[in-house]
């Protein structure tokens, strides 16, 4: 089973993805952007002003996403899919070339056969993580709109997730996965020292990753 959480930056995708991965024992594919940025030994500030560099960066991020998914043989949860192409449209001049490629068409069909959750933005989730484009409400809305356009253009069925409540997001994911016959791992006890440690760990992860 392939499960995707798509949406703009600062919508809580990674937080929910991490929970689903742990709860259902699914391999987690997290965003390729940070890894590619580190490999290129580049900074986000450099990407802002170097068009060739940012074009290479976005092309590599998309290629890496496709390659890593194939390595997992179609069994994973990912905190994004084609999302970076919205950023390519926002910051580069190669978006048309990327979207005209056979690989893009094949990938969108591949995504359409998975479970797609579309996490919508909310001002309360804005947080600057020092990696992605300036975390402004206007930027978030532009990326959100482009991702929705691509979902609709390619007839990809998706579940919109409007709530910012982690509990409600978890319930939405659990409902869909249960209807798909995916069983969760047994829950850890919440009483006792181990239970408190697990609760503290989850709370800490939620607070640190909420903006992803």
Regions found by a protein language model. Name each.
Residues 9:
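The conserved Walker
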Residues 56-111, 126:
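Glycine-rich phosphate-binding loop used to anchor ATP phosphates in small-molecule kinases
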Residues 156-160, 167, 171-212:
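C-terminal accessory "lid"/substrate-recognition subdomains
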Residues 1-2:
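Pre-Walker A (Motif I) flank of P-loop NTPase domains
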Residues 93-165, 170, 190:
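A glycine- and Lys/Arg-enriched "phosphate-lid" helix/loop adjacent to the NTP-binding pocket
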Residues 13:
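Conserved lysine of the Walker
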Residues 5:
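Hydrophobic anchor at the beta1->P-loop junction of P-loop NTPases
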Residues 18, 22-66:
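Conserved substrate/cofactor phosphate-moiety recognition/catalytic segment
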